[in-house]
């Protein structure tokens, strides 16, 4: 599908979503069908004095990619291009959330997870617009069981109004003060607590593209599945929250093994959040900054090492590398040392009516060093809107539209143009352009806590390369909560 045809399709939907903004009547939804609600209805579980809880989810996503035009693919034996022929892939996940109250304000959570996946093109060829967010889990077609989270949480009330927190995955039903300290220590995803957004975070019931899960340029320290170890502290003061985390970095970029020398190599982040009501509609603004110290190579140093000695190329490295067979290209393995990476971002969400919400994210990272844990992006924006189905008597349905655009630094582009690769991209050369993605989805509530989503994505300039694409990706997603 051409961009012009895609644009013609977007106009009517945008008009419907953003101009049909009268306030819908409030809808009272029945309690979701979960194990906890079933037990509570039988008198076997007490939400008012919840000592434990258990939840789960199943998600299966099937992707189809069309063939697309490309001036070249894997030029000069550089291996990281998105393949230009049609492909299909899938992901399947099962997650089980267990919570236990230890004492007043103390809670313990453990979350085992199963992943099975087959990525398009071996998960190569897309920078910050990877079409399926579950692909960060680093699985194989054979299901793999692992522990995703195991952490302790302590809440210290400091006064103010009482706030009720409903029972949910990784949250025991409880009442807390509006002024409070919250400490967490253990194994978790930093995205469990940072850069949350009501309309673009919980992608199992929203978008599919990884650009909408968080800032594409947020290179948060984590293993290849997106998890880490460390500590998080939050201070809540009514409508304000400030949170800080010090977390462990991976031993090698985008790999599973973590480096527990957490005061030598680490990721720090701080976020300031303000929640507000604007014209009787809820919203929030979040400012995020991160600073990583990791054993990573800079684009400039890798190029300089190759230019000084062509034997220091992509095929001769004995350290960690991405298996490039391009002997005329530089490689980051010759430049790895302790380096600093920093980034700053803004995250905004706003309800326009009871059933319409919009969001925006934007982040700038310095772009001097290699991607270590997330996507091959140095700066990014994303925006979009969700509309609930109350307007057409489908209260649990959702329709969404999103747009994302990502950039890389000049140093990053120069390295790629010399034939270098990073964890996800490298076509052998590059006609540097911004990556862009448009995504449309309709999430249909089939019954109870079962959703079926049809999803379409139009991806432009894959791997920041104007010589390749555009690419159309179609998906069907089945999601069950229990």
Locate each region found by the language model.
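Residues on the lipid-exposed face of transmembrane beta-strands in outer-membrane beta-barrel proteins
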Residues: 56, 94-100, 150-154, 185, ...
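Short loop/turn motifs that connect adjacent beta-strands in outer-membrane beta-barrel proteins
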Residues: 39-54, 65-67, 99-108, 121, ...
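Outer membrane beta-barrel transmembrane domains
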Residues: 271-273, 288-338, 359, 366, ...
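Residues that define the transmembrane beta-barrel architecture of outer-membrane proteins
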Residues: 50, 88-94, 143-148, 225-229, ...
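Surface-exposed coil loops of outer-membrane beta-barrel proteins
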Residues: 125-142, 161-271, 420-425, 430
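Transmembrane beta-barrel strands of outer-membrane/channel proteins
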Residues: 54, 58-62, 110-114, 183-187, ...
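N-terminal regions that are enriched for targeting/export leaders
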Residues: 26-101, 111-113, 119, 125, ...
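Outer-membrane beta-barrel "beta-signal"
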Residues: 26-29, 148-161, 401, 470-482
């Amino acid at each position: 599908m051409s961009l012009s045809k895609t644009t013609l399709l977007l106009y009517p939907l945008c008009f419907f979503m953003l101009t049909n903004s009268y306030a819908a009547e409030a809808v009272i939804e029945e309690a979701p069908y979960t194990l906890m609600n079933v037990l509570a209805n039988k008198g076997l579980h007490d939400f008012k004095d919840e000592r434990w809880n258990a939840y789960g989810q199943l998600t299966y996503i099937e992707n189809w990619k069309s063939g697309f035009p490309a001036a070249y693919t894997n030029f000069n034996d550089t291996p990281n291009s998105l393949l230009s022929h049609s492909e299909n892939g899938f992901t399947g996940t099962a997650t089980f959330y267990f919570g236990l109250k230890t004492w007043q304000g103390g809670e313990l959570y453990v979350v085992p997870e199963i992943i099975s996946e087959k990525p398009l093109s071996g998960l190569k060829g897309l920078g910050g617009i990877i079409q399926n967010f579950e692909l960060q889990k680093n699985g194989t077609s054979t299901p793999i069981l692992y522990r995703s989270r195991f952490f302790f949480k302590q809440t210290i009330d400091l006064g103010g109004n009482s706030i009720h927190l409903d029972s949910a995955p990784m949250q025991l039903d409880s009442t807390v003060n509006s002024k409070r300290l919250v400490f967490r220590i253990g194994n978790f995803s930093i995205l469990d607590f940072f850069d949350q957004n009501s309309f673009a975070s919980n992608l199992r019931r929203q978008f599919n593209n990884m650009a909408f899960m968080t800032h594409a340029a947020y290179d948060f320290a984590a293993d290849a599945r997106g998890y880490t170890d460390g500590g998080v502290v939050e201070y809540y003061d009514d409508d304000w929250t400030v949170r800080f985390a010090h977390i462990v970095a991976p031993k090698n970029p985008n790999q599973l093994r973590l480096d527990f020398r957490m005061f030598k190599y680490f990721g720090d982040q701080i976020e300031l959040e303000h929640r507000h009501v604007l014209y009787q509609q809820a919203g929030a603004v979040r400012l995020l900054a991160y600073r990583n110290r990791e054993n990573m190579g800079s684009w400039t140093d890798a190029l300089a090492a190759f230019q000084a000695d062509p034997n220091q190329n992509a095929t001769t490295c004995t350290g960690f590398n991405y298996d490039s067979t391009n002997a005329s290209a530089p490689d980051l393995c010759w430049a790895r040392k302790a380096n600093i990476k920093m980034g700053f971002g803004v995250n905004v969400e706003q309800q326009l009516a009871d059933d319409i919400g919009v969001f925006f994210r934007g982040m700038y990272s310095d772009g001097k060093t290699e991607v270590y844990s997330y996507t091959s992006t140095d700066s990014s924006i994303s925006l979009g809107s969700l509309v609930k189905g109350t307007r057409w008597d489908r209260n649990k349905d959702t329709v969404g539209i999103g747009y994302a655009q990502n950039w890389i630094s000049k140093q990053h582009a120069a390295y790629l143009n010399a034939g270098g690769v990073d964890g996800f991209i490298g076509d052998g050369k590059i006609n540097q352009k911004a990556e862009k993605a448009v995504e449309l989805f309709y999430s249909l509530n089939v019954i109870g806590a079962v959703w079926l989503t049809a999803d379409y994505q139009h991806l432009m300039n894959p791997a920041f390369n104007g010589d390749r694409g555009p690419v159309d990706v179609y998906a069907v997603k089945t999601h069950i909560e229990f």
